[in-house]
A protein has these predicted regions:
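Short, solvent-exposed loop/turn elements at beta->coil junctions and helix N-caps
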Residues: 36, 79-81, 130-134
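Extreme N-terminal tail/first-helix region
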Residues: 1-27
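Short beta-strand segments
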Residues: 28-60, 76-77
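Charged, gly/pro-rich active-site loop segments
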Residues: 2-5, 10, 85-159
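Helix-adjacent hinge/juxtasegments
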Residues: 61-90, 97
Length: 159
């Protein structure tokens, strides 16, 4: 266990276990997704659903999608903040996979749709709620998933 003393109001920061990391990611709905292009980082909030070692999400076309298409290595940060001295944070490292509307990805695309639609307002960061699962040729909507390669987590509690 790693500790950090901060004066009269001590706080302990410790590494979370793999099981604790997975529990936080599973319970979460909002992440901060980071990608990079030509050495320039870019971070945005996303709504997501977690299943089978993937984060599933949805977006409109734009900088985030363009950058992930050119460099699929990404990370996402998910947290549970109770207070400045009581929080959990997990960083997920993974690989972007676009779920285009074509033969070979329909099952994964439909799975993303079904997982995301279980959560209220999942479409808000994507700007527009589709009525039916969107068709790539008729829409600028992009379903994607992040394959999780590894996770690290920290937890802070008041001592």
């Amino acid at each position: 266990m790693m500790g950090l003393a901060t004066g009269a109001d001590d706080m302990i920061v410790r590494e979370m276990t793999a099981q604790e990391n997975t529990a936080l990611v599973s319970a979460g709905r909002l992440a901060r997704l980071a990608c990079a292009s030509e050495g320039q980082p870019y971070m945005v909030p996303i709504h997501y659903a977690f299943a089978d070692n993937y984060l599933y999400s949805f977006s409109m076309l734009g900088q985030k999608i363009d950058w992930m298409r050119s460099n699929p290595k990404v990370c996402a940060q998910i947290d549970d903040l109770t207070s400045a001295r009581n929080w959990k944070s997990v960083v997920v490292y993974g690989v972007f996979e676009e779920l285009a509307d074509r033969i070979g990805t329909k099952v994964e695309r439909d799975r993303a749709w079904s997982l995301l639609e279980k959560h209220a307002n999942w479409w808000e960061p994507g700007s527009l709620k589709p009525v039916l699962p969107p068709v790539a040729s008729a829409s600028n909507h992009v379903f994607y998933r992040i394959y999780i390669e590894s996770m690290t987590g920290r937890q802070a509690v008041e001592a």
